[in-house]
From Swiss-Prot:
Name by which UniProt lists this protein: DOMON domain-containing protein CBG21753
Pfam families: DOMON
Highest rank taxon of the organism: Eukaryota
Primary subcellular site in the record, as a coarse category: secreted
Ranges annotated as biased composition (Basic and acidic residues): 156-168
Source species: Caenorhabditis briggsae
Length: 168
């Protein structure tokens, strides 16, 4: 019930601008471009405690920058960094790089149905990339967190060529 109310509130919050959507097995994402940033609602509907997930940006699968979500002790932590298609993320010092900080609006984990949902605001100029331009976005399923260390993700990320201003 609470999860549904939060999802409806987030969708209504996105309704004031053109909202884009990605829905694929295990993921639901909504985003909109406004005020030189991208407001992203990221949901992974198949993530367990002590796992990580994320979204990477870039056409080169071996050189992605992204926002990563760690679920540990049923709490969600948000960090930024870089990764490859299967590698665990390398985090930026203090989670930011080159002044491009990500603002977390909400981050929740629902252990009873293994769903993680977060709303983040990402600056268009993000870690040396212009997210306003068309490029691949890659939804990373999950990797384990073992003794505080992130392991490789075992499945290839789902990708989509995204032009944030066009909702393609």
């Amino acid at each position: 019930m609470i999860k549904s109310m939060i999802l409806v509130a987030l969708i209504l919050a996105f309704a004031s601008a053109k909202t884009c959507k990605y829905d694929s097995s295990g993921f639901q994402s909504y985003w909109r471009f406004a005020n030189n940033s991208i407001m992203l609602q990221f949901m992974n509907t198949d993530i367990k405690n002590n796992q990580w997930t994320g979204i990477g940006f870039g056409d080169d699968k071996n050189n992605l920058v992204g926002v990563f979500f760690m679920v540990s002790n049923n709490q969600v932590t948000v960090r930024t960094g870089s990764t490859t298609e299967h590698g665990p993320p390398n985090f930026n010092q203090n989670g930011t790089n080159m002044g491009s900080s990500v603002s977390t609006q909400s981050a929740l984990y629902f252990p009873e149905d293994e769903t993680m949902s977060a709303v983040v605001q990402i600056p268009v100029q993000f870690q040396g990339r212009n997210l306003q331009s068309c490029q691949k976005w890659r939804w990373i399923k999950s990797g384990k967190i073992e003794n505080g260390q992130l392991t490789r993700n075992s499945k290839s990320p789902k990708d989509k060529k995204v032009c944030p201003m066009e909702c393609n």
